[in-house]
UniProtKB/Swiss-Prot annotation:
Its main location: cytoplasm. Together with the chaperonin GroEL, plays an essential role in assisting protein folding. The GroEL-GroES system forms a nano-cage that allows encapsulation of the non-native substrate proteins and provides a physical environment optimized to promote and accelerate protein folding. GroES binds to the apical surface of the GroEL ring, thereby capping the opening of the GroEL channel. This is Co-chaperonin GroES. The keyword Cytoplasm applies. Belongs to the GroES chaperonin family. It is found in: Cytoplasm. GO terms for molecular function: ATP binding; metal ion binding; protein folding chaperone; protein-folding chaperone binding; unfolded protein binding. Gene3D superfamilies: GroES chaperonin. Keywords: Chaperone, Cytoplasm. The gene is groES. PANTHER family: 10 KDA HEAT SHOCK PROTEIN, CO-CHAPERONIN GROES. It comes from Syntrophotalea carbinolica (strain DSM 2380 / NBRC 103641 / GraBd1).
Length: 95
């Protein structure tokens, strides 16, 4: 990936959800919602505070994260789709 996010921004690759339910029903594309979790692919240096100090990021590359349905912006890099969002948009890290 040839992009480095600035400040407190994070690039996330969405994790696609299952297309079949536990009961074996196939979910059509028209009924699917965008997944709200993904893998962190790149992180910025951190948030710059008013006094000029940089608050380091709690999130690191490789973390599996949860985020809101409308968080961030969709971008396309090298033909792949990603979300770019601020660290504040991340709701939690799955461990």
């Amino acid at each position: 990936m040839n992009i480095r996010p600035l400040r407190d921004r994070i690039i996330v690759e969405r994790i696609e959800e299952e297309t079949t339910t536990a009961g074996g029903l196939i979910i059509p594309d028209s009924a699917k919602e965008k997944p709200q979790q993904g893998i962190v692919k790149a992180v910025g240096k951190g948030k710059v505070l008013e006094d000029g100090t940089v608050l380091p990021m709690d999130i690191k590359v490789g973390d599996r994260v949860l985020f809101g349905k409308y968080a961030g912006s969709e971008i396309k890099i090298d033909g792949l789709e990603y979300q770019i969002m601020r660290e504040d948009d991340i709701l939690g890290v799955l461990e």
